[in-house]
Amino acid sequence: MGSISLPEKHHAVCIPYPAQGHINPMLKLAKILHHKGFHITFVNTEFNHKRLLKSRGPDALNGLPDFQFKTIPDGLPPSDVDATQDIPSLCESTTTRCLDPFRNLLAELNGPSSSQVPPVSCIVSDGVMSFTLEAAAELGVPEILFWTTSACGFLGYMHYAKLIEKGLTPLKDASYLSNGYLEQSLDWIPGMKDIRLKDLPSFLRTTNPDDYMVKFVLQETERAKKASAIILNTFQELEDDVINALSAILPPIYTIGPLQFLQKEVKDERLSVLGSNLWKEEPECLDWLDSKDPNSVVYVNFGSITVMTPGQLVEFAWGLANSKQTFLWIIRPDLVSGDSAILPPEFLEETKDRGLLASWCPQEQVLSHPAIGGFLTHSGWNSTLESICSGVPMICWPFFAEQQTNCWFCCTKWYNGLEIDNNVKRDEVESLVTELMVGEKGMDMKKKALEWKNKAEEAAKSSGGSSYSNLEKVVQVLLSK
């Protein structure tokens, strides 16, 4: 991935939505653009900047002369430094309060105090931080929107307006959540024939005609049409029909994933220390995995936002215990809503020789470890794609947003996943974990997962890979003025 020889250094400002699952892919992309010759300014919120310093150490965000970290406020009142922020509040705050601080930051970057820094020449913004388009237009620079969802999740959001128009949402009353209404199949969304209403991004399951998240999705998908281009962390071969459907209704769309494979070309050691985990990682997990047989461990991690009830936690625990499989289970400090995650002492005693509990881990390294044989996941897009990159089949327990859509594609199109009922019961956990790890269906899924891994690697190859060649096109868009 040779760096382009830029006559004068171009300066890309990268601004992710301030949540873990959005910061990770944006930082990968920023490192790739830096490798391509761009000066990078990476913009975190002040809240997340503090969290990163706490989890990664006081020098973690010193950056480099041409890769700097800056902050803007998120507009929310202060909260517990280790808690995941409330998503609707954060969406409302970024939409209404972040444009002026972002404008001020751009003015500072272009001002006399930044004489050693080239002027801002392009913006790469998270797809749901579209207020930045206004600032890009004022500066007269191109802006690319990076939707960090799957293509299928993004297409689901793009159809919210049509779902409202057809009267499918908001729901008439709360009984529609459980009376079979959400099970109906839709045959009119291109690239998603026969998807059930329940498999579309979950914000539509509201009875409130003024639901904020629905309004937010409508606003962000409408503004997406104003971008110079849209990029997605996926690859053409995985979501071909969906990407073609998106391309028919939006500005140029470029699939540049999996970014974790494209990033392998970046050999700059100075960049490898720049990480993005908001929780302190426990790398001891990897030492423990080294002592396990290949394909013998179930990895359990519900991501950075999922919360569950104490009852659900206990059902997962006993399902894992009763499966008799070896497991590595990541339990965030705030995994149980409004409570601390307390596991039954009997469970801890029974599984002490075959289970390891940790609060956070370096997930890409864990998933690519030969000991991992399956992944019990919330189906967030980063986790799903990292699982695909490692050739690991999944049990899917989606929590919210487009995770349900990712789950549907895993289970019905890609054949590398099994769905677990939202109303989790230990018997189902036990039977699915057993099937995944030692059953015939599990073996078929493992084969399919390895096929997808190979296709992902092909897409990222510099010799003709679809994502690699799209990345070159993205660079050209960012260089255009």
Curated annotation (Swiss-Prot):
Induction behaviour: Up-regulated by methyl jasmonate.
Positions contributing to an anthocyanidin binding: H22, A401
Tissue expression profile of the protein: Ubiquitous. Very low expression in stems.
Domain of life: Eukaryota
Enzyme nomenclature, EC number: 2.4.1.324
Keyword Transferase belongs to the record: yes
Signal peptide residues on this chain, from the entry's feature table: none
Alphabetized UniProt keyword annotations: Glycosyltransferase, Transferase
Binding annotation for UDP-alpha-D-glucose: T148, Q363, H378, W381, N382, S383, E386, E402, Q403
Residues annotated as catalytic: H22 (proton acceptor), D126 (charge relay)
A GO MF term: quercetin 3-O-glucosyltransferase activity
Catalysed reaction, written as an equation: 7-deoxyloganetin + UDP-alpha-D-glucose = 7-deoxyloganin + UDP + H(+)
InterPro entries per the UniProt record, alphabetical: UDP_glucos_trans, UDP_glycos_trans_CS
Family designation: Belongs to the UDP-glycosyltransferase family.
Function: Iridoid glucosyltransferase acting on genipin and 7-deoxyloganetin. No activity with 7-deoxyloganetic acid. Involved in geniposide biosynthesis.
Protein name: 7-deoxyloganetin glucosyltransferase
